[in-house]
């Protein structure tokens, strides 16, 4: 009888380790996809703002994004205060990308692709932000992001006009995110 219990417990332990590994690999890939897609959308945002002569900086909008992210963080079991640096880093990287596109277009040809409305693009950005918070929360249930996770994310995080400093800031802020107690 004891032997059967020992075998059962060993099997359970192996299954939980396998499950945790699969959650980790799936969540890292999904997180990376959402991060890259979010940054790719900045080209659309920059094009719209250029066409309509809008500033890149929008303090009121940023405050709304923080409030929405903190609420979504709470809903997903994350410490809302720990998510603030991550959201800030995403916004800073996003604005940097927009400025870089504007500089390119002002010295060369303007965008020649169909420009999405800002409301449609912002809706998709919000969906991606919420998706990232869900993924991060699920990932943190099985443990913190490891050094290897961060190395992998850094190697794969590669949207146009995103530089190494932007990537470092986003990943450093990601490592600060915690689950709520």
From Swiss-Prot:
Single GO molecular function: chorismate mutase activity
Pathway in which this enzyme or protein is active: Metabolic intermediate biosynthesis; prephenate biosynthesis; prephenate from chorismate: step 1/1
SMART domains, sorted: CM_2 (SM00830)
NCBIfam families xrefs: CM_mono2 (TIGR01806), PRK08055.1 (NF005965)
Stated name of the protein: Monofunctional chorismate mutase
Reported function: Catalyzes the Claisen rearrangement of chorismate to prephenate.
Organism for this UniProt entry: Salmonella typhimurium
The keyword Isomerase belongs to this UniProt entry's keyword annotation: yes
Keywords annotated in UniProt: Isomerase, Periplasm, Signal
Catalytic activities: chorismate = prephenate
GO CC terms, sorted: periplasmic space
Domain of life: Bacteria
Cellular localisation: Periplasm
Span of the signal peptide: 1-20
Ranges of residues in domain Chorismate mutase: 21-102
EC id: 5.4.99.5
GO process terms (BP): chorismate metabolic process; salicylic acid biosynthetic process
Predominant location: periplasm
Entry-linked SUPFAM superfamilies: Chorismate mutase II (SSF48600)
UniProt-annotated binding residues for substrate: 38, 49, 58, 62, 98
């Amino acid at each position: 009888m004891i032997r059967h219990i020992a075998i059962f417990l060993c099997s359970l332990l192996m299954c939980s380790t396998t499950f945790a590994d699969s959650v980790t690999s799936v969540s890292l890939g999904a997180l990376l996809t959402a991060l890259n897609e979010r940054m790719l959308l900045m080209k659309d945002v920059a094009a719209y703002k250029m066409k309509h002569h809008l500033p890149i900086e929008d303090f009121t909008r940023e405050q709304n994004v923080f409030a929405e992210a903190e609420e979504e963080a709470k809903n997903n079991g994350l410490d809302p205060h720990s998510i603030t640096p991550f959201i800030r880093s995403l916004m800073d990287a996003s604005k940097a990308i927009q400025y870089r596109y504007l500089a390119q277009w002002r010295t060369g040809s303007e965008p020649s692709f169909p420009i999405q409305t800002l409301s449609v693009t912002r809706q998709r950005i919000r969906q991606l932000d919420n998706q990232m918070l869900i993924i991060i929360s699920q990932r943190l249930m099985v443990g913190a992001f490891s050094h290897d996770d961060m190395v992998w994310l850094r190697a794969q995080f590669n949207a146009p006009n995103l530089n190494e400093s932007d990537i470092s800031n986003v990943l450093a802020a990601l490592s600060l995110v915690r689950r709520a107690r």
